[in-house]
């Protein structure tokens, strides 16, 4: 059946390192075609240097580098007093220093058991202890982590399990 999609109303601005942009162009080539069909997302790519801060609509964003595995670099972001790190397995001390003074840290914690390319809960809690944010949220969790109602009470009081539709209020 033919679906008559409305024209794209909102453009998606995507900020990423050159390597990531190359993957996006390849995996979503239809979004960058000369003649797009209706309903295809309108994506505007913005190349960033992960070693330098950049600005989006007047808001400074500080890239935080880490590794997903030995050979695969990842980038998290600090925006004001919030930082978002996902797919991290390791982070250098110099990058951890970028996280001082946070109100909120969102960090991946795949499961309790060790994993080769993601922080487990113990590793995430270790990073949280080093950074000392006012609050921390665990994200990128697998089903192995257990039920929210059973697992969250085992965490330190300022550490929470994130969930879909969670909204975090940040006061500057």
Listing of model-derived features with the role each one plays in the protein:
Residues 1-85, 150-172:
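Binuclear metal-dependent hydrolase catalytic cores
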Residues 1-7, 90-98:
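Pre-active-site segment of Zn-dependent metallo-hydrolases
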Residues 51, 92-172:
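Binuclear metal-ion centers of metallo-dependent hydrolases, dominated by the metallo-beta-lactamase
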Residues 63-64, 85-87, 107, 138-139:
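Thr-Gly-centered strand-to-loop micro-motif
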